[in-house]
Amino acid sequence: MGRNTRKRRTPLATKIVAGAAALAVGGGGLVWANFYASAHEDHGGHNRTRSAGAQVATIDCPDVGQKIRDVPDRARGEVDGELATMDSQITNAYQRLATTRRAQAGDSQFVQNTILGPLKDRRKAIIDRIQLEINRAGGKADDNLDELAGCQGRPADQQNGGGQNGGGQDQEGNDDNGNGVAGPVAEDFVDINDVRPNSRDSRNGLAADGDGGSTGSFTTDCGVNENNLFNSDNLIAAPGVDNGAHHTHDYVGNQDNDAFSSDEDLANADTSCQNQGDKSTYYWPVLRLQDGTQEFDANDQGGGAEGNIGKILKPAEAQIRFVGSRQGDVVAMPKFLRVITGDAKSFTNGDANANSSWSCSGFEDRQVTDKYPLCPEGSQVLRTVNFQSCWDGQNIDSANHRDHMAFVQEDGSCANGFQAVPQLQIRLAYDIPAPTVENGQVRNPYAVDSFPEQLHKPITDHNDFINVMDEDLMNEVVDCINRGEDCQ
């Protein structure tokens, strides 16, 4: 496999390289040292680590990007770049946390004095620059952003915002799956038979369609990334920033996807979709099987150098559908509309923006948000998502990349000030052998790529979409849905 060829164009702001050094060299290439490491024990030829229950496992920082509003257009690029630098600061602080366990054991103030304190100072400097850039561009920056500079350390068994089940270590504190990376752990998995039917309890990701209103659908077949288009950029959240995602994305549809792609590039690109009028970009973090495979990105930022290791698993099927609203007709999406659904930082941010849903084929009435399912033989692992489908009627993006779109309410309606557009629903099916979970350990687990400090938690799953359908095709999609027909 190989990643796409980057164009390396210079954006309005200076290109920012968001990266962190690899921490340790292991049998699978450059990998991250285990985040709990406090004492080592040999077990069956593996150098395992055992955790201390009170030890800091990861770093929890307020998400400044979600608190920013009303950024003038001419400051957007600079602000996005500063936010990407903050992400790199967290990655580097996590690196420091993971490689200083011996010092931490001998000094109860080590984490605060040498990691969290300096991190706060660096974040404060960037927040000051963000405020200056917003004000200089004619906006009014929030004077209280400085309150978000401080971060805290916390053990892995604390997940902000609750969830269906607790996450983290097992009661014995065993955390090393044998691959030397920070997660997943045994407690991140659940037998699908143990999940109660219809128990997914989230206000996000409800289906917009139903028996009434606009009952049609439009299916677009864009393959399963046969062209091996991968990179660790995020064109929506971090335009102009190399490795802005800190994890590898899997792309279908538009074939010109990297941090430096302009709207013109997207419009002129090839597409993997059978309907050549659909040049939209659909992307999500890859799933990997942590089996020791050295992938093409084993030594790269966003890959093995940031703890995302193992064999990349392509979906056996990627079903992409647009559906209507059970409350009435839908209107066309504007071209280049950008939508992020789910939250790549929801392990530390909490579940306010989370939109993960895991299941197994044949068990789709059982959906789980914060666990990976263990599926029986012959059953596929499923990742499903229903995007936000309420548009503010004006903007193709917003300062925090969320405010211009909203999820449907419980009755399928949009809140005041929003109008219904076709809802994007994606269903990814994977052929994955079930990991072995035994005695509080997991062997050959699969996991979603993540920011290093997010510990590969399943609740961090997310999807991204940029609408690049031509006007005729978008009108066809809307007409089909509103007429109650199933088209493709």
Residue ranges and their predicted role:
Residues K7-T14, G27-A57, G162:
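C-terminal region of N-terminal signal peptides and the immediate post-cleavage residues
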Residues A20-G28:
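Core hydrophobic alpha-helical transmembrane segments of single-pass membrane proteins
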Residues A93-Q104:
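Secondary-structure edge/capping motif, primarily at the C-terminal ends of alpha-helices
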Residues S108-K120:
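Short, charged, amphipathic alpha-helical segments
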Residues P118-N135, D157-N160:
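Amphipathic alpha-helical coiled-coil segments
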